């Protein structure tokens, strides 16, 4: 089988005294800041291994297998070894430990380099892939992203539009599950913790036909009691139950040399809280005694199914043909309490359906000087979302005042009368129902190549010609269900005006009714990539790449107006410097990326004035961001290794265009929401007395603002410490673990400074686990 990446054996170039001087300062620099994707000691053929050599890590997220040191893209890799060492159980455990990546609303949403995966428009800016299948962003809080039987997780930072295509302007997260092997193997694990969160898991595989057909199955079950109690309903607010089941087949037929096929099916069934799990902070000791008083259940019932078929055929040592087929089907029912109180005033239910089918064909070439791929991609996505809810619309004082001025009143009188009306009717209760359907078809031709201009200098290039057809339609009904103010109660002089306001209010509700026939839009984009990579010696390489990022346009539904509104694509140009280095005879890896991104035609949400629901997406923003990531890992010896990461990201809105009739805040000079400037992580593994192991790691995130603008409130910085200690043999492991070891209290999100409702970070969790392997 040909190797799709270059692993040439070269004479080592002696390091200069200057290089040694730089090296001598690296441990202090890194401990004061840097980074890392975990690596483990390489094993010699006899199994003894080199206790101070790090494993070669392969990065596959760019669809060509390259070593981490050959990859110029900024990527953080978490292997199955690190998942076990740190007792990582969910994708967000990894994101919280990754440089320039941060959580947003608890387990709902994340940022990469300060860019939110969901921002400004329905389609995401970053996508999570499971075995090559793109997961809908709407299930990031309740999808199949737990880490049981996961082989590797790659967080690709920066535009991935050339290779991944749609919805990857900020980056991509690639999860690969464990493949079947031609040997019998298995593992089983049980975990228990306080607060109660029991988990049980099993994975096993074996050959069905020796050397030709093998299978692997994995199952995990969880029954979490939750952190938040609800005295109104007498239940837990954020309890979760989930069951994940996966089956995989590997086929390498003896009669077809060079052919391999992997078939995977995952079913993930979850019952849990709504995407945002709020607690009240207007109660004593709100961090330790978490309370939610909602009378209406805030819940999610999600069934996600993912199937993939990957076929590789090595026609020769140089040529390989790959076919990747994926299908995802997600059914989701959610309910929520909008007012978050014990009063039955505002609540709702949604039914959501997401279906995606994609097919990709790639031709890989690996020659002496030229390596790369060319591919064809096609996908079809369908969504069907329905909602029924009781909504309390804040009485729009400014809109009423404008109507009164249009009728001839002066501004002062109109404002005073509008204020009196709002006192009588502070909110407008509306029964609202809607259904929106969309279908998108994406076709693309793409290529990614590396050509050796000399023994050490390589040209990097690629492109994607992307075509998307998007169709969206919606229907909505709205009905006023409250009691209007009695005009007679305001006296004979004001009664006519109050009656007129009543009619205007009913007209506003009526305007939210609408039937919008499906409309189709087509987008084309050319996304180039060009760069250079120079290998100074076998252990040191630098690179520079410029590439274009892209998010397609589409249509959004304006609830208040009952209409669709179109918006156009947005683009970025990304320039990135990379450093890849190994030191101390490959015991220390130090990698870094420095980037600058220019963002044009940014998709933002604009208000149009009727009420709080009169908004839709427009292209009005221009922004830029810059920063760096540094990552290091060092195996000091058989008994100790450490790793660290440091990220810095500075985001800035530059200007906002004027949109007719729109109310767009001029955020020029402001930072993005949930864009921490600094992220830092450090950890280490200790081994002693043959069988004892321990891991301790800490993560830091600087302060962030959940809003945008000079007066936006900020959430304080937070530092979390986690640990694991255990006893390991060849067959079994018993261990203790703790997350948020010092029980640091921190807020993930709040409506505003005065709001009693907040999303809190997880408290300290202490538990035990046992795993058996065969």
Predicted regions and their residues:
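Gram-negative outer-membrane beta-barrel transporters
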Residues: 371-373, 455-459, 596-598, 618-709, ...
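Solvent-exposed loop segments that connect transmembrane elements
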Residues: 228-236, 275-293, 337-347, 388-435, ...
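N-terminal Sec signal peptide and the immediately downstream disordered periplasmic leader
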Residues: 1-98, 205, 257-261, 313
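Outer-membrane beta-barrel domain signature, strongest for Gram-negative TonB-dependent receptors
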Residues: 210, 234, 240-387, 404, ...
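Extracytoplasmic beta-strand/coil segments of soluble accessory domains associated
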Residues: 60, 92-133
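Outer-membrane beta-barrel translocator/receptor signature
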Residues: 124-125, 137, 148-157, 162-230, ...
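Membrane-embedded beta-barrel scaffold of Gram-negative outer-membrane proteins
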Residues: 310-336, 535-551, 558-559, 566-657
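C-terminal beta-signal and adjacent terminal beta-strands/loops
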Residues: 4, 691, 700-707, 727-774
């Amino acid at each position: 089988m040909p190797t799709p990446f270059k692993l040439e054996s070269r004479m080592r170039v002696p390091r200069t005294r200057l290089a040694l001087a730089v090296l001598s300062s690296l441990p202090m620099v890194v401990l004061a800041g840097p980074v890392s994707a975990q690596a483990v000691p390489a094993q010699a053929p006899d199994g003894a291994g080199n206790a101070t050599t790090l494993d070669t890590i392969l990065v596959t997220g760019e669809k060509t297998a390259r070593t981490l040191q050959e990859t110029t893209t900024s990527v953080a890799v978490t292997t199955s070894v690190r998942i076990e060492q740190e007792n990582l159980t969910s994708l967000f455990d990894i994101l919280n430990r990754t440089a320039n990546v941060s959580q947003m609303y608890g387990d709902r949403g994340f940022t990469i380099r300060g860019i939110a995966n969901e921002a400004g428009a329905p389609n995401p800016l970053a996508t999570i892939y499971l075995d090559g299948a793109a997961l809908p962003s709407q299930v990031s809080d309740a999808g199949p992203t737990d880490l049981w039987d996961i082989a590797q997780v790659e967080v690709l930072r920066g535009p991935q539009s050339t290779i991944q295509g749609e919805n990857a302007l900020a980056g991509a997260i690639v999860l690969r599950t464990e493949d079947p092997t031609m040997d019998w193997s298995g593992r089983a694990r049980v975990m228990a913790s306080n607060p109660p969160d029991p988990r049980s898991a099993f994975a096993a595989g074996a050959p069905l036909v020796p050397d030709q057909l093998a299978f692997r199955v994995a199952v995990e079950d969880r029954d979490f009691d939750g952190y938040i109690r609800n005295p109104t309903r007498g239940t837990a607010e954020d309890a979760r139950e989930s069951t994940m089941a996966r089956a995989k087949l590997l086929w390498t037929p003896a009669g077809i040399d060079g052919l391999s096929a992997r078939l995977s099916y995952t079913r993930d069934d979850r019952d849990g809280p709504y995407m945002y799990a709020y607690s009240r902070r207007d109660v004593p000791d709100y961090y330790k005694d978490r309370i939610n008083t909602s009378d209406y259940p805030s819940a999610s019932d999600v069934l996600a199914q993912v199937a993939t078929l990957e076929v590789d055929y090595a026609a020769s040592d140089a040529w390989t043909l790959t076919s990747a087929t994926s299908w995802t089907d997600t059914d989701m029912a959610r309910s929520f309490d909008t007012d978050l109180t014990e009063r039955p005033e505002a609540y709702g239910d949604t039914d959501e359906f997401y279906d995606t089918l994609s097919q990709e064909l790639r031709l890989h070439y690996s020659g002496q000087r030229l390596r790369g791929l060319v591919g064809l991609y096609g996908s079809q996505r369908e969504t069907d979302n329905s909602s029924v809810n009781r909504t309390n619309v804040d009485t729009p004082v400014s809109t009423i005042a404008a109507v009164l001025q249009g009728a001839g009143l002066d501004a002062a009188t109109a404002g005073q009368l509008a204020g009196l009306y709002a006192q009588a009717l502070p909110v407008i209760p509306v029964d609202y129902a809607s259904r929106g359907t969309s279908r998108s078809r994406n076709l693309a031709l793409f290529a990614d190549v590396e050509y050796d201009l000399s023994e050490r200098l390589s040209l990097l290039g690629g492109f994607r010609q992307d075509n998307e057809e998007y169709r969206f339609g919606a229907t909505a009904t709205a009905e006023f269900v409250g009691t209007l103010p009695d005009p007679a109660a305001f006296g004979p002089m004001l009664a006519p005006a109050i009656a007129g306001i009543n009619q205007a209010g009913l007209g506003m509700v009526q305007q939210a009714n609408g039937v919008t026939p499906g409309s189709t839009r087509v987008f084309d984009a050319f996304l180039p990539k060009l760069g250079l990579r120079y290998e100074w010696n076998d252990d040191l390489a630098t690179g520079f790449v410029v590439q274009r990022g892209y998010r397609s346009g589409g249509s959004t539904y304006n609830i208040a107006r009952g209409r669709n509104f179109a918006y156009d694509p947005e683009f970025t140009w990304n320039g990135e410097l990379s450093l890849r280095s190994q030191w101390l005879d490959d015991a220390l890896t130090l990698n870094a990326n420095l980037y600058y991104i220019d963002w044009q035609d940014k998709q933002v949400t604009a208000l149009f004035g009727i009420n709080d629901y009169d908004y839709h997406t427009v292209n009005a923003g221009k922004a830029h961001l810059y920063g760096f990531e540094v990552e290091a890992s060092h195996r000091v010896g058989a008994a100790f290794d450490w790793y660290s990461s440091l990220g810095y990201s500075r985001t800035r809105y530059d200007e906002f265009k004027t949109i007719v009739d729109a109310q767009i805040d001029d955020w020029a000079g402001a930072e993005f929401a949930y864009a921490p400037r600094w992220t830092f992580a450090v950890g280490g593994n200790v081994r002693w007395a043959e069988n004892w192991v321990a891991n301790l790691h800490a993560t830091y995130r600087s302060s962030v603002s959940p809003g945008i603008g000079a007066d936006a409130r900020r959430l304080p910085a937070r530092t979390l410490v986690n640990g694991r200690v255990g006893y390991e043999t060849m067959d079994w492991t018993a261990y203790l673990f703790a997350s948020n070891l010092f029980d640091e209290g921190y807020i993930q999100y709040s409506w505003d400074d005065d709001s009693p409702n907040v999303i809190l970070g997880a408290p300290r969790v202490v538990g035990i686990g046992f795993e058996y392997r065969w």
